Each structure stands twice: as structure tokens, then as C-alpha cells.
Amino acid sequence: MRGREVPLVLLALVLCLAPRGWAAPVTAGRGGALAKMYTRGNHWAVGHLMGKKSVAESPQLHEEESLKEQLREYAQWEEATRNLLSLLQAKGARGHQMPPWEPLSIHQPAWDSEDVSNFKDTGPQHEGRNPQLN
């Protein structure tokens, strides 16, 4: 029985004396040299790569895209303002009748509205199902 306990006691003693943590222990004599070499740890590449930009990116290209986006937004606001103005003018001229308004160009469908060859006429099939909607 005594032969089994000795290895367990030695294992417990080694584990208690072992340093806790993920890093390998450094001897006392070399600790100062390593501390001077790697003062900021292992993150030397972080500072080295900060502020680097791609060569393909140019400020002029970014400015042109920004101007195009501003022009698109301005055109949308102008179109919305025209629609609102026509609504207000029609309301004042005709009382409460709503004028025909133009939808904003950004909400137009992506398909060709003239091409209806792919649509099937399903009207007669649904006549008897829901009479209050007919």
C-alpha cells in the first residue's frame, strides 16, 4: 500500500510547485533580457501595420463616389419635393381631391412592366371563393 502512495505524493508536490499559467516559466537570470527585448509583448506587428492603406484606394476615387452619392440623394429629395408641391397645389385648387402622383424612381420595379407573357390569368378560378372581395 505504501508503494502506491509515494508516486501520488510526488506528483502532488510537483504540481504544487509548478507555476500556474499558460506561459512557459523563464529563469531568473534571463528574465531581464527578455523583458528588454519584448517590452510590449508579442504585438510588434500591430503598430507596424497601423495606418497602412491599400494602393488601389485613392482619395480622388473616394471623392468622386461621394459626389455621385450626394447627387443621387439631391435628385431624390428634389423629386420628393416636386411630388409634395403638386399634392399641396392640387389640394388647394380642387379641395380634397388627390392628384395623380408620380412614384419615386427608386421604387420602380426591376422587371419590364410591358412584358406580361409569364403571367397567368387566374381570375375565374377564384371567383366563387371569396364573394365579398369581387
Swiss-Prot record:
Detected in adrenal medulla (at protein level). Residues 54-134 form a propeptide. Residues 95-134 are annotated as: Disordered. Its main location: cytoplasm. The keyword Signal applies. Keywords: Amidation, Cell projection, Cleavage on pair of basic residues, Cytoplasmic vesicle, Mast cell degranulation, Secreted, Signal. Residues 123-134 have a biased composition (Basic and acidic residues). GO terms for cellular component: extracellular space; neuron projection; secretory granule lumen. The keyword Signal applies. It is found in: Cytoplasmic vesicle, Secretory vesicle lumen; Secreted; Cell projection, Neuron projection. InterPro entries: Bombesin. One of its GO terms (molecular function) is neuropeptide hormone activity. The modification Methionine amide is found at residue 50. One of its GO terms (biological process) is negative regulation of voltage-gated sodium channel activity. Residues 1-23 form the signal peptide. It holds the Pfam family Bombesin. Stimulates the release of gastrin and other gastrointestinal hormones. Contributes to the perception of prurient stimuli and to the transmission of itch signals in the spinal cord that promote scratching behavior. Contributes primarily to nonhistaminergic itch sensation. In one study, shown to act in the amygdala as part of an inhibitory network which inhibits memory specifically related to learned fear. Belongs to the bombesin/neuromedin-B/ranatensin family. This is Gastrin-releasing peptide. The gene is GRP.
